Amino acid sequence: MRQLAPYALIYLLAIACAAGLATQSQAADAPLQVPIGYLGYRPDPGPLLSNVIPEPADAGLRGAELAIIDSNSTGRFLNHNYSLASASVDSPEALLIAAKAQHEQGLRLFVVNAPASSLRQLSAALPDSLLFNAGSPDDSLRTTDCLANVLHSLPSRAMLADALAQFLVIRKWQRVLLIVGPTADDQAYAAALRRAAKRFGLRLVAEKPWSFDNDQRRSAQADMPLFTQTAEYDAVLVADERGDFGEYVPYQTWYPRPVAGTQGLTPVGWHKTVETYGAAQLQKRFEALAGRWMNDRDFAAWIAVRSIASAVSKLRQTEPMAIRALEISDQLPLDGFKGRKLSYRPWNGQLRQPIPIVQPRALVSTSPQDGFLHPFNEMDSLGYDKPEVSCRFP
């Protein structure tokens, strides 16, 4: 019996080792879970003076959903599993509550489609998380109010205005009339247009505030020619983000000139008419999912989730600040179906990207335009460059 004791001990040790190896194997086989939160809040714009087609209520969310599907199609080969927890609310208070609830569930990566004020609140409330701004084009978030835990996948107003100004310069439409709407967003867009005009050599022959409160559906043909009667211009720039009057400016100006800005010839982050470099496949997948066209907020949310997935694939982890550090490095070129590799600017967290210039049914051009050079990256000719930004990240 005593002779059997050593063999019994060896047998028990073998069983214990096998059990340990089995446990390790099961742990190794467990997929890396990558939960992402989507937080949506779009303020009610109030009554409009035109019958403008409203933005889809699910703009942004559908782009994030498609990106989760795309990320899982490749992530399964790496044993990564992506999931989306979404909350679309009707007030900034409800948005903050939803964000904290998702945070308590363990989420640390978020895509936010909300105004700048809400983004600032979320950034302060979730300091250990990484937020992707897919909803606010506010320039102050990229120049003076930069948030250390926020990256911007939506183009800034400055990027849009610079993209348009480059195209106007190329076409030699350098004398412009600027019409500015009454809202704070209109004023911000107009400020971006003024900056772009000065930067690229456009000349403002006149600037007019829009002060009418009547329905232009009935009176545009009578009002607009007189309103736009100034010194001669090559183009009319419109700053009307809500769509109160801008749709009625084209074809009604005193001089027969193109209209551009928020209406007419428009710089956008994304549009249905973007089809090259594989974009047509993205458009088809989105339309099959959402039953509508993909817009700029959808694309911003899509590329935000894809940015996370690309970083996780390389890092094999989900730590927010490690992801942020990789995103703003030059080690993570992103494919955004825009003909160039995209990346985030380290000085303000803005996604570098070409900007399509479109009319409602066609792609007209894409900026940066040929000839507008930059010592580091031509896409940095759009928006605020490093010397123009006062942000200092830790």
Where in the sequence are the language-model features?
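Bacterial N-terminal signal peptides
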Residues: 8-20
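Extracytosolic ligand-binding ectodomains
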Residues: 2-7, 23-394
